C-alpha cells in the first residue's frame, strides 16, 4: 500500500506543478538534501511536535531556500497526513512520472551476456517507439536470465528473457491443467 500511496501523492504533485516543473524539481532536490539529516527526519516524524511548528519550520526553509509555494504546501499536506517518512519515495515517483510526461525515462538493460552494439540498438529502437527516449541507460549482465534481455524503465518492465518466457509457459500450463 505504501508504494501505491507514494504514487498517488506523486501524481498529484505532477498535476500541481504543470509548467513549473524545473523550479519545483530544483526545490525537491534541495529538500531531499535537507531531509538526509537524521535530526530533520526525526523532527518531522515526531508525533509530539505540533503540526503548526512543522509548518512554520517548512515556511522558514521556503524563505531561506526560495522554494516554490506549491511545493511547500504539498509537503505540508504530506507531513499532516503523517507520511513524511515516505517523502523520498514520493519524490522518486514524481521524477519518474515527470520523465514519463516528457517522454523520457531511466533504463536498465539486463542481459545474460554483454550485448553487441547491434543487439542494443535493436532493443533501444523498440523501446523508443513504445516509451520515448531513455535519459540514462545502465547495462548489466545476469547469467541467471539464461538469454534474451530484461529492460526496466521507470514505469515499465519488458521481460524478453528465457527465464521470463519459461515462467510464462509455466503459468499458462498451470491455467490449462486447472481449467480441465
UniProtKB/Swiss-Prot annotation:
Domain of life: Bacteria
Entry GO CC: plasma membrane; proton-transporting ATP synthase complex
UniProt entry keywords in alphabetical sequence: ATP synthesis, Cell inner membrane, Cell membrane, CF(1), Hydrogen ion transport, Ion transport, Membrane, Transport
Protein purpose: F(1)F(0) ATP synthase produces ATP from ADP in the presence of a proton or sodium gradient. F-type ATPases consist of two structural domains, F(1) containing the extramembraneous catalytic core and F(0) containing the membrane proton channel, linked together by a central stalk and a peripheral stalk. During catalysis, ATP synthesis in the catalytic domain of F(1) is coupled via a rotary mechanism of the central stalk subunits to proton translocation.
Family, per entry: Belongs to the ATPase delta chain family.
Subunit structure: F-type ATPases have 2 components, F(1) - the catalytic core - and F(0) - the membrane proton channel. F(1) has five subunits: alpha(3), beta(3), gamma(1), delta(1), epsilon(1). F(0) has three main subunits: a(1), b(2) and c(10-14). The alpha and beta chains form an alternating ring which encloses part of the gamma chain. F(1) is attached to F(0) by a central stalk formed by the gamma and epsilon chains, while a peripheral stalk is formed by the delta and b chains.
Official protein name in the record: ATP synthase subunit delta
Gene behind the chain: atpH
